[in-house]
């Protein structure tokens, strides 16, 4: 089992020459490879895409076997992938998924990091995060609009809709957290983001998500103060330990205007640098003494939350951004760790009630012009949404593509299927140079059960009910998605979430059009269904407006 191979450099093929038998199998092949592009993945030589140890394949032998299998797969066959390892090819039919993926799933009694890590060491499991093991990660852009929407809503609720002269403090510049600086600037706020790894800071600078960096707190605060006084938002990366820095700010009485965190706290061994440790010491001990790392990291997380609670008590809008930091602190004795809310119940849930979430697509041609054309098509088909148009304009101006050109665009039920059909038609008539794939984050309205994140504080108390992502995966399979995934532990770690993903190929064929119509209607409809069942009036009204047949919910 080879987990680390520095000789490997992976990039997705582009253009119209097929390496597999059809676009239905070429698409997952390219997206798997795209997940490991050097500008996309955090540690591609280790198959780690983002989120601590979120991998695209279990090991390099499994990666090679997946690639070779996809190349020979017929359009009436389905490949089964078990925790990043290809385990079977079965005859199905043309409208069935070409790939079905199950990652990191454990029987609930054993669903914890200790048991998972034992399996992982033996080569029997792989942590798939959300879009790492489901082959639809598109770099930091994949989370940037959701982060932007959150920051805009924070500005609306707390500052009258204007973040000019305000600044956000946060931690973590990895694959998810790396979106925060650009999202803050897009929303009109400056951002001070603390990151312990210089390589992560360098990647955000290289890919345009961060404006500048320093290793000196006083210099960082000077840069933030200058940008706020000038009313010109700027993002500053600070090399350091976020728990140390936040405690120092509290001690000095330096108050940010907004406060959150996106370190990989969900994984106390691989995701969070303990206070007083060097990165080199951490990297060594993660392998040689993981329990020592976990103990020290958890203690540091508790200190981190205590500092966040200190600012919360001072009236600073403070929000958990879904990394389970509060839970870790609670388990370390911080009894009031949940005094501040998670970002979904505080700012995002009304969108989920209408099936609105992180719709994304990638151009398999590799040509950025294909994304420009699809951006224009979105504006054409959704003409009366100036907020969406502003997002697309900002994205075109400010977001650098990582790997295959791609776009994230939060739209909901009734729009996703129309856009998918339009993209498919653009492929058919040659307007796009090659097919596109449409997918989404597992963080969506109907595809996840995560009581400390997406389903926190549900109106009916159904936070932990995980039937919903299972139904979502089953329905997307029945509807004909090109690949479907079912994962455990993404975002918040082992034992705290179950979630499903789907991707569908727009190859310009009539058969694809039928699948697209089913999948891109049914997928967001499950989110409306789930929230209507929980009693949200917005979701109930949306279900009625869209004519959903929900017999046990609407009566």
UniProtKB/Swiss-Prot annotation:
It is found in: Cytoplasm. Pathway: Amino-acid degradation; L-histidine degradation into L-glutamate; N-formimidoyl-L-glutamate from L-histidine: step 2/3. PROSITE patterns: UROCANASE. Its main location: cytoplasm. It catalyses: 4-imidazolone-5-propanoate = trans-urocanate + H2O. Its EC number is 4.2.1.49. Belongs to the urocanase family. This is Urocanate hydratase. It comes from Stenotrophomonas maltophilia (strain R551-3). The lineage of its organism: Bacteria, Pseudomonadati, Pseudomonadota, Gammaproteobacteria, Lysobacterales. The gene is hutU.
């Amino acid at each position: 089992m080879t987990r680390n191979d520095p000789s490997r450099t992976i990039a997705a093929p582009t253009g119209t020459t097929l390496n597999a038998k059809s676009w239905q199998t070429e698409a997952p092949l390219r997206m798997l490879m795209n997940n490991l592009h050097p500008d996309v993945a955090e540690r591609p030589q280790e198959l780690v895409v983002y989120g601590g140890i979120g991998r695209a394949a279990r090991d390099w032998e499994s990666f090679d076997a997946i690639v070779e299998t996809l190349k020979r797969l017929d359009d009436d066959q389905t490949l089964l992938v078990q925790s990043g390892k290809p385990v079977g090819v079965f005859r199905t039919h043309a409208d069935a998924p070409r790939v079905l993926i199950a990652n990191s799933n454990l029987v609930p009694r054993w669903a914890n990091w200790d048991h998972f890590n034992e399996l992982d060491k033996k080569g029997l499991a792989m942590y798939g995060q959300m879009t790492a093991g489901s082959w639809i990660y598109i770099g930091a852009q994949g989370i940037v609009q959701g982060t932007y929407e959150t920051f805009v809503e924070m500005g609306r609720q707390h500052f009258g809709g204007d973040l000019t002269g305000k600044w956000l403090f946060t931690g973590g510049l990895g694959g998810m957290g790396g979106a925060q600086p650009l999202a803050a600037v897009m929303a009109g706020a400056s951002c001070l983001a603390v990151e312990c790894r210089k390589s992560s800071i360098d990647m955000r600078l290289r890919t345009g998500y961060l404006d500048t960096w320093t290793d000196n707190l006083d210099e960082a605060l000077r840069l933030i103060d200058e940008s706020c006084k000038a009313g010109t938002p700027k993002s500053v990366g600070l090399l350091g330990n976020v728990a140390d820095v936040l405690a120092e700010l509290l001690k000095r009485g330096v108050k940010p205007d907004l406060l959150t965190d996106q370190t990989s706290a969900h994984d106390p061994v691989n995701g969070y640098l303990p206070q007083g440790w060097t990165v080199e010491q951490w990297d060594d001990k993660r392998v040689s003494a993981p329990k020592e790392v976990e103990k020290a990291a958890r203690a540091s997380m508790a200190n981190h939350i205590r500092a966040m609670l200190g600012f919360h008590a001072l009236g600073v809008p403070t929000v958990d951004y879904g990394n389970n930091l509060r839970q870790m602190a609670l388990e370390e004795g911080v009894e009031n760790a949940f005094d501040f809310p998670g970002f979904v119940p505080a700012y995002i849930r009304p969108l989920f009630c209408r099936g609105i979430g992180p719709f994304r697509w990638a151009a398999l041609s590799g040509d950025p012009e294909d994304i420009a054309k699809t951006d224009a098509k979105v504006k054409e088909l959704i003409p009366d949404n100036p907020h969406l148009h502003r997002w697309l304009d900002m994205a075109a101006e400010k977001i650098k593509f990582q790997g295959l050109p791609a776009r994230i665009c939060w739209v909901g039920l009734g729009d996703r299927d129309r856009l998918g059909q339009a993209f498919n038609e653009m492929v058919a008539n040659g307007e796009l140079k090659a097919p596109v794939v449409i997918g989404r984050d597992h963080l969506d309205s109907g595809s996840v059960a995560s009581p400390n994140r997406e389903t926190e504080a549900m109106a009916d108390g159904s936070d932990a009910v995980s039937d919903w992502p299972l139904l979502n995966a089953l329905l997307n399979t029945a509807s004909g998605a090109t690949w479907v995934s079912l994962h455990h532990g993404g975002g918040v770690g082992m034992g705290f979430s179950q979630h499903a993903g789907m991707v569908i190929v727009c190859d310009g064929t009539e058969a694809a059009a039928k699948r697209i119509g089913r999948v891109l209607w049914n997928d967001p409809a499950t989110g409306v269904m789930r929230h209507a069942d929980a009693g949200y009036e917005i979701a109930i009204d949306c279900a009625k407006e869209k004519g959903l047949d929900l017999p046990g919910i609407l009566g």
